[in-house]
């Protein structure tokens, strides 16, 4: 029988195309530092870590096999890499919820990119499957798209709170 972990960190689309080089989001270095802190905290606490990797379409910067498709953080042994081709990682991977439950996870901490697409969809997907969901303030970002990225992040944060997602400050996040 596996020991109950309780918590999992789901890193959504933390791939080179959005965090390295010309196609990176604004503030990519600082944001990568935020994610590094969350990842270190999760690993130190013995929480499950799931790396979600988007499979872009042919010609996209995150097309499978392209340099931008590669993960920024190297998964450790026992940290699954889950591929997806729609925004919600749970929709692309129907067994993901069962895998998390088998690991004893009841709370998922979701972080990564992009706020209004894959982060929001995956967080809501986790809620719909009965998990407690945490999306730390400052742990998701996006690009300017008709409005500044900061405005998009703020709007998504309010929508997540309205949906029932906990949005603590980064320094309040624990994995146990």
Task: Show where each model-derived region lies.
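Anionic group-transfer/hydrolysis microenvironments
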Residues: 15, 55, 85
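Short acidic, Gly/Ser-rich segments with clustered Asp/Glu that frequently serve as metal-coordination loops
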Residues: 15-21
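Active-site-adjacent betaalpha module
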Residues: 1-8, 34-43, 62-176
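A short alpha/beta connector and helix-capping loop motif
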Residues: 23-51
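Glycine-rich, proline-tolerant flexible connector loops at the mouths of alpha/beta enzymes
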Residues: 56-60
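Short, glycine/acidic-enriched capping/hinge loops at junctions between secondary-structure elements
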Residues: 21-22, 61-63
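N-terminal nucleotide-binding beta1-loop-alpha1 segment
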Residues: 10-14
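Short, well-ordered beta-to-alpha junction loops that form the rim of enzyme active sites
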Residues: 54-55, 113
